[in-house]
């Protein structure tokens, strides 16, 4: 019988996701600027919603690029 390995969330459950924490947000965005899906990030549904809102807010504020400038 094969058991699925339980993934640990990369962000602690009680830890707030702030749009000003650009280094954290960059970990959840592809090189093309797309937000990674929950099945890849390993976040809970609530954390994924908060992360998406934070990334979008950071983009609007100019802290995070819509598309990666490198390459």
Curated annotation (Swiss-Prot):
Coiled-coil spans in chain: none
Ribosomal protein listed as a keyword: yes
Top-rank taxon, per record: Bacteria
GO biological process entries: translation
Pfam assignment, any one: Ribosomal_S18
Keyword line: Ribonucleoprotein, Ribosomal protein, RNA-binding, rRNA-binding
Entry keyword annotation includes ATP-binding: no
InterPro entries from the UniProt entry: Ribosomal_bS18, Ribosomal_bS18_sf
Cellular component per GO, a single term: cytosolic small ribosomal subunit
GO molecular function: small ribosomal subunit rRNA binding; structural constituent of ribosome
PANTHER family noted in UniProt: 30S RIBOSOMAL PROTEIN S18, SMALL RIBOSOMAL SUBUNIT PROTEIN BS18M
Purpose of the protein: Binds as a heterodimer with protein bS6 to the central domain of the 16S rRNA, where it helps stabilize the platform of the 30S subunit.
Summary of subunit composition and partner proteins: Part of the 30S ribosomal subunit. Forms a tight heterodimer with protein bS6.
Family: Belongs to the bacterial ribosomal protein bS18 family.
Name recorded for this polypeptide: Small ribosomal subunit protein bS18
Taxonomic placement: Bacteria, Bacillati, Cyanobacteriota, Cyanophyceae, Synechococcales
Recorded name of the encoding gene: rpsR
């Amino acid at each position: 019988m094969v058991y699925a390995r339980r993934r640990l969330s990369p962000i602690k459950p009680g830890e707030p996701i702030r749009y000003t924490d650009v280094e954290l947000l960059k970990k959840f965005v592809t090189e093309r600027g797309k937000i990674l899906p929950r099945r890849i990030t390993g976040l809970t549904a609530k954390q994924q919603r908060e992360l998406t809102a934070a990334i979008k807010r950071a983009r609007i504020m100019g802290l995070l690029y819509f598309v990666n400038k490198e390459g």
